[in-house]
Amino acid sequence: ADTNAPLCLCDEPGILGRNQLVTPEVKEKIEKAVEAVAEESGVSGRGFSLFSHHPVFRECGKYECRTVRPEHTRCYNFPPFVHFTSECPVSTRDCEPVFGYTVAGEFRVIVQAPRAGFRQCVWQHKCRYGSNNCGFSGRCTQQRSVVRLVTYNLEKDGFLCESFRTCCGCPCRNY
């Protein structure tokens, strides 16, 4: 596992030049591969995905930017979390990750193919620890949940469906 792996998706340290690992050549290769999937579908028309006939995209393509909403990546939408009544302040932002670390800590290129019409977005719900509204006894805890995203395997020239951790909420916990 890579020691640079951050707590949550979209927190990858840009300072290490990691963004440069996804070169224009790699981006072009991914675009072409995604275009090929779209062409296979033979489907035209709006309202449903061009990619749903492909098993990996069907299983894993739920975070298309055009349909994903902030609440899709909130913890309380996933078992075993329940919606905590007291939550410390959260900053919410969306991102389009081009790479990340899987739950197993493995570095992956995440599929982004804007030209082919497939972009993946994840909303981060990160604790703003500076303003801790949990009272005197509680503490703000960063919750994480798992999202499944389409990745691209450069060695095998193929798509995979893989799990990543994303920051999803900040319940107050008593210790």
UniProtKB/Swiss-Prot annotation:
Disulfide partners: 8-167, 10-95, 60-161, 65-121, 75-168, 88-140, 127-170, 134-172
Domain of life: Eukaryota
Pfam families xref list: Coagulin
Family matches, as Gene3D superfamilies: Cystine-knot cytokines
Expressed in which tissues: Hemolymph.
Localisation: Secreted
Keywords: Disulfide bond, Hemolymph clotting, Secreted
BP GO terms, sorted: hemolymph coagulation
Cellular component GO terms, alphabetical: extracellular region
General function of this protein: Coagulogen is a gel-forming protein of hemolymph; it hinders the spread of invaders by immobilizing them.
Quaternary structure, from the entry: Coagulogen is cleaved after Arg-18 and Arg-46 by a clotting enzyme contained in the hemocyte and activated by a bacterial endotoxin (lipopolysaccharide). This cleavage releases the peptide C and leaves 2 chains of coagulin, A and B, linked by two disulfide bonds. Coagulin molecules interlink to form a gel.
Family, as annotated: Belongs to the coagulin family.
Protein name: Coagulogen
Organism for this UniProt entry: Carcinoscorpius rotundicauda
